[in-house]
Amino acid sequence: VFSDTGVQTSLQLKTDDGIYINLHEAALVDYPAMHLNLDDKTMTFTSWLTPDAQGMKGYMQTPFKSPWRTMVITDDARKVLSSNLILNLNEPCKIKDTSWIHPVKYVGVWWEMISGKGEWAYTHDYPTVKLDGTDYVHAKPSGKHSANNANVRRYIDFAAAHGFDAVLVEGWNIGWEDWSGYMKEKVFDFLTPYPDFDIKALNEYAHSKGVKLIMHHETSSSVMNYEKYMDRAYQLMKDYGYDAVKSGYVGNIIPRGEHHYSQLEINHYLHAVTRAADYHIMVNAHEAVRPTGLCRTYPNLIGNESARGTEYQAFGGTKPGHTAILPFTRLQGGPMDYTPGIFEMDCANGSHCNSTICGQLALYVTMYSPLQMAADFPENYEKHMDAFQFIKDVAVDWDKSIYLEAEPMEYITAARKAKGSDNWFVGGVTGMKAHQSTVKLDFLEKGKKYVATIYQDAKSANYKTNPQAYVITKKTVTSKSVLKLNSVAGGGFAISLLAQ
């Protein structure tokens, strides 16, 4: 039985004498995910494997390989963040030709549904639907369906104008009227668009602008149904020029009684990735198992969520210290599609994002991912184009990463060198307390000058009452320069360092 004091990995600990201990696992394949039971009397952990619907832990035939159990122990928190232990315990890349795998910076039809402005569903006419029997053609549109032709074109135009690679579109396919909470097996077919989403015309329009659409496959956790349609769904993507899919596993797993972390599901997640590779499709899996470094073996697994991402800011808010914890926990196993970039902190549903704009900018550096979203509405960025410039400039693939300072839940400052470039980017996030960072630029190439554009919280900034207060300064710097930067609680700073 999983204990009331049990915990999930990756677990970050700190002893009274300042030793940092990180516990996780690596190379989780054909095996149930591990949790840790805690005996709070003896303070000892015991491995607890996620059972299947029958209560069995797993089925293996010898010889077999179990996942690695990992421990990172250090007196310097930065070394936890820079460790490649988990990644290196995975097998080398198994995909022979990786030329089709690439980093992606994207916008999307997503935040407006999450924050209460729009909806995934097309109509309110039907409280329940059947994929092969509901007449959507004659249904009355609700007027709130976000994935419509005009709105998607608006996002495509915005992406093209500002140099983004792609546009994610959620809610394009039939079935969203009763997708959640009913444990329907045949909930989506991943093939049939709503009447107001012209899949052919929209992809042609996007491609004419130098932009691609990102497919969305919400499974509602009906994984057997997804596997039934998977090949046809991937082929549809190739037919229309998609090369990336965001998959989702919201809700209780079907087959009923299975768990997101049981052996059956672990095998399904990897099957979806390996089958996608056959079609040259990159996968960004949300609500799946927390990563264990498999992106080394299967680099088309370009992103994962598997933790409280930005969407929870629209579900009542997340404490500011959260983004100073995730790199020590969730990101130990691989990159996270955190979906940062919120500029308007007050959501249409009454929730508030507990961050400043500069705190959001910093996440593009501190939260590693080769898949980065600018999640807010185009109109919210257009009000702050000077701050938005950092999102346009920041790289998503790196040659080198350095952690300048770090303390779990309090602050993290990272510097990364853009891949194939002399440019660097720095990001710093804070938790529940204000923090002053002393940033030594000695990682820059000696003898070279850089134009530093510094985005930092204004003195009056407050993540609750004044989150849009920021100051932008420019100066010429070298490897001898030292910057002192003040961040408010829930805030941060971002710096672009462009080589001259």
Residue ranges and their predicted role:
Residues 1-96:
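N-terminal accessory beta-strand-rich subdomains and adjacent acidic, glycine-rich linkers
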Residues 61-162, 166:
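An acidic-aromatic substrate-binding cleft motif
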Residues 159, 283, 366, 426:
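Conserved, mostly hydrophobic/aromatic
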Residues 358-405, 494:
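Catalytic cores of secreted or luminal carbohydrate-active enzymes
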Residues 454-480:
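Solvent-exposed beta-strand/loop surfaces of large extracellular or lumenal domains
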Residues 474-500:
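C-terminal beta-strand-rich structural cap/linker in extracellular carbohydrate-active enzymes
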